[in-house]
């Protein structure tokens, strides 16, 4: 769990902002949301495969060359 030391004469909202930033960088929120509900291993593999397919389609679309007709 990330922690911060509140500096002397530091306002609470600035300390809270620093704490949130550290939590975001550590990935605490995403990890908690991911582990909120149980996910079957088959669902995990299915989701990962779908993400891989989406990535490849996105990369192929980015590299696709469109021919321009010259008439």
Curated annotation (Swiss-Prot):
The keyword Transmembrane does not apply. Coiled coil: none annotated. One of its GO terms (cellular component) is ribonucleoprotein complex. One of its GO terms (biological process) is translation. The keyword Ribonucleoprotein applies. Keywords: Ribonucleoprotein, Ribosomal protein. InterPro entries: Ribosomal_bS21 (IPR001911), Ribosomal_bS21_sf (IPR038380). GO terms for molecular function: structural constituent of ribosome. Belongs to the bacterial ribosomal protein bS21 family. This is Small ribosomal subunit protein bS21. It comes from Vesicomyosocius okutanii subsp. Calyptogena okutanii (strain HA).
């Amino acid at each position: 769990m990330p922690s911060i030391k509140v500096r002397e004469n530091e306002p609470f909202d600035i300390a809270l902002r620093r704490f949130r930033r550290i939590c975001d960088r550590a990935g605490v929120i995403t990890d908690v949301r991911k582990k909120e509900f149980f996910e079957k291993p088959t669902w995990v593999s299915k989701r990962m495969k779908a993400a891989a397919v989406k990535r490849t389609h996105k990369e192929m679309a980015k590299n696709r060359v469109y021919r321009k007709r010259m008439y």
